[in-house]
């Protein structure tokens, strides 16, 4: 907390006192398709959407941060004055300190000063040239010699990670206090933004961060969520489980992010079941060992089956699997392998509720698969899985192919999307 700032937040269910004239107006974006909410909010505040139209009046500086902006800020360049690249723990403070130095200055002076902060990108101070009208980006050059030619995203090296500041029934995860257990992922699947964008893999200190945060959060809610791309690979995860197994936490409901199959033990399943968790989630991507080797998903079908057996033995009622179609190298035989694996699972763990949520591969910047496109065959492949799994009593939940295409445009697009 800083005593030199007055911070107001926008919610759907409560109102905090809002300033008559905001100086800084910030957004954090974790998913490409949330972009529409940004425009809605700006319009509701009668703030012009495009940065070039915010020069005539005393409009706030519009800034953005989070994984979507860090991965590829260019589609948002025409709408934002400032984009913060990387982890915000330290970067946000440096940004505010620089702004205080030029608080009363003209906007162009403010932006030039802010451009000197490592990790701060001012899109209007850079000129983009392309290889022809519809070609690739040829260069992104500063318009002035005093503007940094190269920007470096910022990486937080501490061992105290984030936790919820708001708990509400209106959130995506209703009334859950979320605690970030790890950041990044050591597995390095070739499609995964969470691995490559947020390197290195970091874990929160058990005694210094996790336990104090959990204790505080459980004073306002009885629902706890452990967040991270690879939660069960925290080096002290067993100790964390032991802490949450204490009798004083018998009445809490524990939720956990997607876990790796080789960490699904009967002990883990029992603890989750005793904390009112009905199921766990495992990202398998495909039932094909061959395709998983291509994408560097270090996982075998035997491990998936054993994880399901352990989950049932520990008292869980179901498993949710994440899958993907349209991955580079995917053939029709790989879809058949997914069907076969799911049906084998159904026989191996009768009574365990199985569901498969399946999305279309979307290329992400900074990953080895960033140069692949969205496979136009993906929509038919989703329908193929849907037809053959639902007829066998498997809960199949496909994501919209059309929205995946839009997500891919934002993930790999540039400023021309705003023309």
Regions found by a protein language model. Give the residues of each.
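N-terminal [4Fe-4S]-dependent radical SAM core
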Residues: 123, 129-178
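Glycine-rich beta-alpha loop elements in corrinoid/cobalamin-binding modules
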Residues: 11-140, 364-414
